[in-house]
Amino acid sequence: MRPYPIKFVSIVIPVYNERQSLPELLRRTEAACKHLNHRFEIVLVDDGSRDDSAEILQQAAERSASPFVAVILNRNYGQHAAIMAGFEQCKGDVVITLDADLQNPPEEIPRLVALAEQGYDVVGTVRSNRQDSAWRRWPSKIINVAVQRSTGVAMSDYGCMLRAYRRTIVDAMLACRERSTFIPILANSFARHTTEVLVDHAEREHGDSKYSPMRLVNLMFDLITCMTTTPLRLLSIIGFSMALLGVLFAALLIILRLIFGAPWAGDGTFVLFAVLFVFTGGQFIGMGLLGEYLGRMYSDVRARPRFFIEKVVRSSSEVVSESVDSSVTPYMNKVAP
């Protein structure tokens, strides 16, 4: 592993209804970046906020000599799509992603950059003393284990978005045009050298988590279907096992019928229906998984943009780019500073 020279660092932060957190976020992130020995930019992507987050970001970007770049999406597309929009607009040799809720400290940015300089393609983080509720922690642990086994990359906390990516990894992710994207897993599929560090995890001071139960369900299906075909293989194994059990159960019923006679066969009707419902339920689960894969294939084949950038505002106090969509080649979407 060789050292990686860094001249410019980009911080990409997706923002959705974070009006109360933004002043502190902007102050702390800029202060942390000033400890870097590199030029930097802070790209904040408003993901269709319903409060005045977009206006706050634009005001910050319009300051004289401001390090902030405001990327305004026309509506809400989700956290990972917003980060991809930020990737298209940033120009750093190393790109740091950070959530806007301040649960992960921006003060960790210099440490991640230092590790990236050592030659790591991806620097992940693990939340110590996690402050989320139990109903968020346990599903996260299960998902982390499942992802590790399906991808073969042993990283402990895929849910923590405070991460550093080398430019080549970012460009590789931008070249992937699928709509259902989970960035940490996608990045690790291209990375050769990865590492993890422990970071603090604070309680959310303002607002609630933007991941509703339905969004968590959608995220789970994205994780299952976007990076592996293992569930389809499991369906084949389960289907074969159910068919074998069905044959064995039918043989058992015939034997019991011969031993106990016709009256017993009549009494066993409800058992037969119970087994039938189990098999039918298994079939519907399999059909649902197949539907998820086919639905995502359909979305990718249509090749619609993953997001639509309404405008990009930089420190020149003018709108640099308007009406940019993600269907354009990533390199064509970049805007000169």
From Swiss-Prot:
GO cellular component, one term: plasma membrane
Enzyme Commission no: 2.4.2.53
Transmembrane annotation, as ranges: 235-255, 270-290
Pfam families, A to Z: Glycos_transf_2 (PF00535)
Entry's Gene Ontology BP terms: 4-amino-4-deoxy-alpha-L-arabinopyranosyl undecaprenyl phosphate biosynthetic process; lipid A biosynthetic process; lipopolysaccharide biosynthetic process; response to antibiotic
Reactions catalysed: UDP-4-deoxy-4-formamido-beta-L-arabinose + di-trans,octa-cis-undecaprenyl phosphate = 4-deoxy-4-formamido-alpha-L-arabinopyranosyl di-trans,octa-cis-undecaprenyl phosphate + UDP
Keyword Ion transport on entry: no
Keywords: Antibiotic resistance, Cell inner membrane, Cell membrane, Glycosyltransferase, Lipid A biosynthesis, Lipid biosynthesis, Lipid metabolism, Lipopolysaccharide biosynthesis, Membrane, Transferase, Transmembrane, Transmembrane helix
Location in or out of the cell: Cell inner membrane
InterPro entries per UniProt: ArnC_tfrase (IPR022857), Glyco_trans_2-like (IPR001173), Glycosyltransferase_2 (IPR050256), Nucleotide-diphossugar_trans (IPR029044)
CDD domains according to UniProt: DPM1_like_bac (cd04187)
Keyword Kinase found: no
An MF annotation (GO) of this entry: phosphotransferase activity, for other substituted phosphate groups
Membrane-topology annotation of the record: Multi-pass membrane protein
Annotated pathway: Glycolipid biosynthesis; 4-amino-4-deoxy-alpha-L-arabinose undecaprenyl phosphate biosynthesis; 4-amino-4-deoxy-alpha-L-arabinose undecaprenyl phosphate from UDP-4-deoxy-4-formamido-beta-L-arabinose and undecaprenyl phosphate: step 1/2; Bacterial outer membrane biogenesis; lipopolysaccharide biosynthesis
Main EC class the enzyme belongs to: transferase
Job description of the protein: Catalyzes the transfer of 4-deoxy-4-formamido-L-arabinose from UDP to undecaprenyl phosphate. The modified arabinose is attached to lipid A and is required for resistance to polymyxin and cationic antimicrobial peptides.
Classification via HAMAP family: ArnC_transfer
Family classification: Belongs to the glycosyltransferase 2 family.
The protein's name: Undecaprenyl-phosphate 4-deoxy-4-formamido-L-arabinose transferase
Organism: Pseudomonas savastanoi pv. phaseolicola (strain 1448A / Race 6) (Pseudomonas syringae pv. phaseolicola (strain 1448A / Race 6))
